[in-house]
Amino acid sequence: GQNAFIVVCPASIVINWMREIEKHSELKPFLVHGPSRERAFDQWQAEGGVAITTYETIQRLKHENLDTIDLLVVDEAHYVKNPDAKRSQTIYSLTERSENVLYLTGTPLENQLAEMVNLVGKLQPDITREMENSVQYIGSNIFKEKIAPVYLRRNKEDVLTELPELTQVEEWLSFGQEEGQIYREAVRNG
């Protein structure tokens, strides 16, 4: 059968996910957001590919009857750190029905260690069962060792060597009459 992948992300980056999947994959992306979300969701279920949706939209869709999801990607996963929130519960339900799950976040630990432990627990419950009294792990290398199977931290220094050479392009444009007038006035007024 077809591969069934879902990307759940904030609305502000849905288009970026669409563009990157089209650019780097042969999988068909489906924008499951906006007025045609139901139709796109049905089409994705029938054809396979990558459904790209938002946290708000996924809560409205009827996904209870979904077969197994091959891969669930949760971008900005810190949005689901509160286990009592409806958004979090929806994502946790999808997580349980997914063969593979990838939580992406630049801020896994915003306020309390328990928030990160909660996210890790959705991916590897065995790890967090060992860490029930998480206070003892704050700032410790033991905590880092415990979560290592599910946590990859990349700093800018780690990836700088993997990036392509910086390309700078200068493009000079001429102002129109009105734009030139606004510019000169802005320069005069400092």
Predicted regions and their residues:
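Conserved motor-coupling elements within RecA-like helicase/translocase cores
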Residues: 38-51
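Inter-lobe coupling linker of SF2 helicases/translocases
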Residues: 52-58, 63-68, 86-87, 92-99, ...
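Short glycine-/polar-rich loops that comprise or flank the Walker A/P-loop
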Residues: 2-3, 27, 97-100, 114-115, ...
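Conserved helicase motor
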Residues: 31-39, 55-60, 81-84
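Conserved nucleotide-binding/hydrolysis micro-motifs of P-loop NTPases
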Residues: 12-14, 37, 57-58, 107-111, ...
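Conserved helix-turn-beta segment of the N-terminal RecA-like "Helicase ATP-binding" lobe
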Residues: 13-35, 123-127
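Conserved Walker A/P-loop ATP-binding site and its immediately adjacent core
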Residues: 2-23, 110, 114-115
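Walker B catalytic acidic pair
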Residues: 75-76
